[in-house]
């Protein structure tokens, strides 16, 4: 018996970290996927070639294996499995590798067990795994990997799928990441020390996200870049940017991008830039020191 499923990675356009405090956020699935295949086996093995992982244990753990171990505990029986994970994105890159892996594994386990409960339950189950492993997580990453396309997560945590022509977006990433759990904990500590200031910062991020959503619904991408720059300034004030992420952000702007910001938890990982009419220039400029790619959207969710 063998089953497989695939889920996309994502880029957060607006609202990362604020979304942990029930502020809205906008995310887009990108054409980089994680595919998981599970098959019956005499003992449990996990193979992730892109990470050089060949792991054998009844309860996989350590790094990204924590997400797999928790999924098996919650959504599988005790029978041994061979689990193979093909990842088209670097782990820890701010592009949602943990969420895409979790959603794809839950999809493969559901098919293996003959379950069919729809995307809402899949997203909820995957979100529970991220919370259990990370200590805190919004439903954003797991929702976008489940539903695909474009998602606006509102302040009541409702998933609103929508369509818009995002135009020319570029994603660039570093070779290292800031561990999401650690970055989320750092923002929580700053919130504890400066609750009023941080509360106002998150309120302002909410205004930026809602302005962007309103304009995208009108298919107006003109203010997108400037709104990204405003969001970046507030991410910097949350303490999640780094010298190198700031260098990438400014390299993209100097090459003509209308705006650019961190995408994901920060501390490392990736940036996103809106580059109307200058995608090639921005990719060329960023590729001098980092790894950049034109992001393709309108991507399917869990399949
Ligand atoms: N080379 C690696 N081997 C195993 N686990 C890794 C490796 N690189 C990153 N990880 C783990 O992968 C997970 C990535 O999840 P996260 O930090 O949420 O980043 P993202 O979701 O943005 O990709 C983390 O648990 C991290 O410890
Ligand atoms: C920082 C946060 O808003 C997004 C984290 O994204 P990623 O795990 O770095 O891809 C956390 C969350 O939404 O759970
Ligand atoms: Mg993650």
Curated annotation (Swiss-Prot):
It is found in: Cytoplasm. Coiled coil: none annotated. The active site is at 141 (proton acceptor). Its EC number is 2.7.1.36. Gene3D superfamilies: 3.30.230.10, GHMP kinase, C-terminal domain. Its cofactor is Mg(2+). InterPro entries: GHMP_kinase_C_dom, GHMP_kinase_C_sf, GHMP_kinase_N_dom, GHMP_knse_ATP-bd_CS, Mev_gal_kin, Mevalonate_kinase_arc, Ribosomal_Su5_D2-typ_SF, Ribsml_uS5_D2-typ_fold_subgr. GO terms for molecular function: ATP binding; magnesium ion binding; mevalonate kinase activity. It catalyses: (R)-mevalonate + ATP = (R)-5-phosphomevalonate + ADP + H(+). One of its GO terms (cellular component) is cytosol. Pathway: Isoprenoid biosynthesis; isopentenyl diphosphate biosynthesis via mevalonate pathway; isopentenyl diphosphate from (R)-mevalonate: step 1/3. GO terms for biological process: isopentenyl diphosphate biosynthetic process, mevalonate pathway. ATP binds at residues 90-100. Pfam families: GHMP_kinases_C, GHMP_kinases_N. It is an enzyme of class 2 (transferase). Homodimer. PANTHER family: MEVALONATE KINASE. Catalyzes the phosphorylation of (R)-mevalonate (MVA) to (R)-mevalonate 5-phosphate (MVAP). Functions in the mevalonate (MVA) pathway leading to isopentenyl diphosphate (IPP), a key precursor for the biosynthesis of isoprenoid compounds such as archaeal membrane lipids. This is Mevalonate kinase. It comes from Methanothermobacter thermautotrophicus (strain ATCC 29096 / DSM 1053 / JCM 10044 / NBRC 100330 / Delta H). The gene is mvk.
């Amino acid at each position: 018996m063998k089953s497989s499923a695939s889920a996309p990675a994502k880029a957060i356009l607006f609202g990362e970290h604020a979304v942990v405090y029930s502020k809205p956020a906008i995310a887009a699935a990108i054409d980089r996927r994680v595919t998981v295949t599970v098959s019956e086996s005499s003992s449990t093995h996990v193979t992730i070639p892109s990470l050089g992982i060949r792991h054998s244990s009844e309860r996989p753990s350590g790094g990204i294996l924590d997400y797999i171990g928790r999924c098996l505990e919650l959504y599988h029986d005790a029978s041994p499995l061979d689990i193979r994970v093909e990842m088209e994105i670097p782990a820890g890159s701010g592009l949602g590798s943990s969420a895409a892996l979790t959603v794809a594994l839950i999809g493969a386990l559901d098919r293996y067990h003959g379950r069919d409960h729809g995307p809402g339950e899949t997203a909820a189950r995957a979100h529970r795994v991220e919370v259990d492993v990370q200590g805190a997580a919004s439903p954003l990453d797991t929702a976008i990997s489940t539903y695909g396309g474009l998602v606006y997560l509102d302040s009541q945590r409702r998933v609103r799928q929508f369509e818009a022509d995002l135009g020319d977006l570029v994603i660039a990433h570093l070779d290292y990441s800031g561990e999401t759990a650690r970055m989320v904990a750092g923002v929580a500590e700053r919130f504890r020390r400066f609750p009023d200031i941080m509360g106002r910062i998150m309120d302002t991020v909410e205004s930026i996200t809602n302005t962007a959503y309103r304009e995208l619904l009108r298919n107006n991408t003109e203010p997108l870049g400037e709104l990204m720059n405003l969001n970046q300034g507030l991410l910097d004030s949350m303490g999640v940017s780094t010298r190198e992420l700031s260098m990438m952000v400014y390299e993209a702007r100097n090459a003509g991008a209308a705006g650019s910001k961190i995408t994901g938890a920060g501390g490392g990982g990736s940036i996103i830039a809106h580059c109307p009419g200058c995608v090639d220039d921005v990719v060329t400029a960023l590729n001098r020191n980092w790894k950049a790619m034109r992001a393709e959207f309108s991507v399917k969710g869990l399949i």
